[in-house]
Amino acid sequence: MRYLIDVHTDERAQQQRLEEDVRRGLTSRPKSLPPKYFYDRAGSLLFERITELPEYYPTRTESALLAEILPGLIEDFLPDDIVEIGAGSSEKTRRVLDAVTAGGRPVRYVPLDVDRLTLEASAERLLREYPSLSVHAVVGDFERDLAHVPPPTGRRLAMFLGSTIGNLDEPAQRRLLADLKALLPDPRDRLLLGVDLVKDVKILEAAYDDSAGVTRDFNLNILRVINRGVDGDFDPDAFRHRAFYNDAAARIEMHLVAESAQTVRLRRLGLTVRFAPGEGIWTESSYKFSRAGIEALLGDAGLRLARWHVDPANYFALALIQRA
């Protein structure tokens, strides 16, 4: 069978988690919302626009770096099993699949994502384009459901790209790396991790506060997602986007700041939330890394760096990782 799908989260479970996350986040100090709620259909389209902006270097830099290292990577390491965490539409995977399925070589692709419809559409396209490919999709949350990834069919390459690990705080980064280690049972298995590097503050802040205002719109869209999800009455026009680099924590922070006193009703939760003028909602952290910092995180998880590839400007790295 060329296509299987395992479902470990559904709309009901996702709704329950959203309600829990919103209640917890908006009754905390400081108030916060998880960045995964950026990505409804409108938010995903806005993020696609962000990746094309001149200020937003991560996507194009990672893509160019992947194209550069892939021939050597595949020459030394030809996987039978490819796992992609947070796969989305699987666009990043095509370069890898082009290389590993050359000559009709059989390969299994295991994408994990919370969006079942996107996974199904992606699987249909990939199966049509790669006759020797089989797909075993997993609908789930990468922070909860990595244990549901099926055992490997052979030598495995797991991929966690886009520096998505930077959206997690350090304890969550450590937990995730421990979970990722469990996906690499064989010493020959590898993990390819994309990491955004510490760099000039002006470059970092411009990437998250672009001149065209697309990131502003992306950030504000989370309020529309919450309104829809919990029957809220946030007024996005009453908040402004703020993004800055926290040097002490080595992270970009994105916030939505109330322009005036606000009272917001979240009817599905039976919750009223008040904002003082200038009070914010912390919507995203994006941690930036160094090689030494990554090596320390890996060591704590029982992993080690096999290769470290950096672009010429030292903006972004692809780390090839194995069991220690």
Where are these regions (language model features)?
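Conserved class I S-adenosyl-L-methionine
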Residues: 79-88
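A short, conserved alpha-helix within the catalytic core of class I
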Residues: 166-180
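Class I SAM-dependent methyltransferase Rossmann-like catalytic core
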Residues: 11, 30-80
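Substrate-binding/catalytic lobe of Class I Rossmann-like enzymes that use SAM or dcSAM, i.e.
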Residues: 203-287, 291, 295-304
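Conserved beta-strand signature within the Rossmann-like core of class I S-adenosyl-L-methionine
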Residues: 182-200
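Conserved SAM/SAH-binding beta-strand->alpha-helix loop
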Residues: 112-116
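N-terminal auxiliary segments of SAM/dcSAM-dependent transferases
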Residues: 1-37, 44
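Conserved SAM-binding loop of SAM-dependent methyltransferases across substrates and taxa
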Residues: 89-104
